Amino acid sequence: MSYGGGYSSSRDHYGGGHHSGGSGYRSGGYGGSNGYSHGNSNGYGSYGGNSHGSGVGSHGGGHHGDRMSNLGSGLKQQEWDLNALPKFEKHFYKEHPNVTNRSAQDVEAFRKEHEMTVYGKNVPRPVETFDEAGFPQYVISEVKAQGFAKPTPIQSQGWPMALSGRDVVGIAETGSGKTLTYCLPAIVHINAQPLLGPGDGPIVLVLAPTRELAVQIQAEITKFGKSSRIRNTCVYGGVPRGPQIRDLSRGVEVCIATPGRLIDMLEAGKTNLRRVTYLVLDEADRMLDMGFEPQIRKIIGQIRPDRQTCMWSATWPKEVRQLAHDFLHDYIQVYIGSQDLSANHRITQIVEIVSDFEKRDRMINHLERIMDDKKSKILIFTGTKRVADDITRFLRQDGWPALSIHGDKQQNERDWVLNEFKTGKSPIMVATDVASRGIDVRDITHVLNYDYPNNSEDYVHRIGRTGRAGAKGTAITLFTTDNAKQARDLVNILTESKQQIDPRLAEMARFGGGGGGGGRWGGRGRGRGGFTASNAAPLGHNRRW
């Protein structure tokens, strides 16, 4: 039998049912006055809202508006007396003789071959086979039954680190095998703890940004936890709470959750985190991207501070570094791949040197070419809210179906705009960096940097909105002489990803210096630009799309 919450164990498997509900939008228009509700457009005026903060659309993610920011306000502040807490075991790693006998040169060569860099004190050596990892036989047999030949690089180094009981940071691309890197040590951890008693919450908590990822993680834990009869549940928004509540009340050793729905459950008293001694933050960068940082902080505040914490991320921006600094203790880190700031190699990067006066014409030229393909979806970044409103108004008056999203827009309007963009009803969205933190749209084909950001990290972050999930993408950047101080960093990124470089940009890099200055988010902009302003500008009669 199947419920949309996803309780599973070796004894009974209530699958992590995919439910497409929870988008929070009802059909029907706002009326003709706003210039949007053409045909079957879902209207702003009938916005229903998702009562569980699962996000807009089917991703169950970053709906970080008024309600999300208040999530967790009902949670009681925990005061921890470590001496009074029950003791628990977290040190399981015993180095295999084969690993011990390898020379330091062999270890270094193995790490170099697999682009593996480690940081921290007394980092364990990597293992090269499943048997060397030191997992109990019941875990090894499950792994070998799946037909894996040998550990992936992140597993080779990550397993000894996680089994050692230390706090761990792992930076590796999606698809690198990181789920098993924390799942198998989690199973060993659970089996070393006392059994759950009545009213106990989970022992292992995995936080993930989206319901899709949460369900994938659940499938792995179900597969490898079967022989240990480990029970798990998947807790995410957009589906009925009943089955999830039922799972939690029965007792589960593992809870995989998106932050918003987990806080719902904690505030409602449906579970607690008193027994959690192994915490995983998966795709930490994406969770922060989606606006979940306040919720993550509130959740971690409910967990005993001597827990083991493992943080996994595809990138290592300063926000993720800050989270690690705040919540991990004396952590060890493994980095798979180059540590230079680099862009996704599936993205074609086009940088054009222009004057400020040429920007609008260049943008229109690109739109005319891009929007010939009706499947195209373009995200345009500006440096300020004022510019976002100005070019949205300009585009709409020229007949382009553009909408803007920034910090001065009301949350319900931002949600509505995002849904129009996701569904392709308005395939052009203009955004500032701050507002883009809540954008999790997989099928963006193009990113256009109308204004260049204040630093290279933000550039890589912006263009990473396209080329997701194995797809190709295109990023177009309008670069002016005012941006010259960023030229050297930009050329380095373009060179690393083997892109063509405009000779004028190369010249700027030689003479214009490097290293970005300025504030994190660019200018502040003036004016509120509410729903009756740029987004309400009627589409011009010369329909361009």
Curated annotation (Swiss-Prot):
PROSITE patterns: DEAD_ATP_HELICASE, HELICASE_ATP_BIND_1, HELICASE_CTER, Q_MOTIF. GO terms for molecular function: ATP binding; ATP hydrolysis activity; RNA binding; RNA helicase activity. CDD domains: DEADc_DDX5_DDX17, SF2_C_DEAD. ATP binds at A172, E173, T174, G175, S176, G177, K178, T179. Gene3D superfamilies: P-loop containing nucleotide triphosphate hydrolases. Its EC number is 3.6.4.13. A motif (DEAD box) lies at residues 282-285. Residues 159-334 form the Helicase ATP-binding domain. Its main location: cytoplasm. Residues 362-509 form the Helicase C-terminal domain. Keywords: ATP-binding, Cytoplasm, Helicase, Hydrolase, Nonsense-mediated mRNA decay, Nucleotide-binding, Nucleus, Ribosome biogenesis, RNA-binding, rRNA processing. GO terms for biological process: nuclear-transcribed mRNA catabolic process, nonsense-mediated decay; rRNA processing. Associates with polysomes. The Q motif is unique to and characteristic of the DEAD box family of RNA helicases and controls ATP binding and hydrolysis. This is ATP-dependent RNA helicase DBP2. It comes from Coccidioides immitis (strain RS). The gene is DBP2.
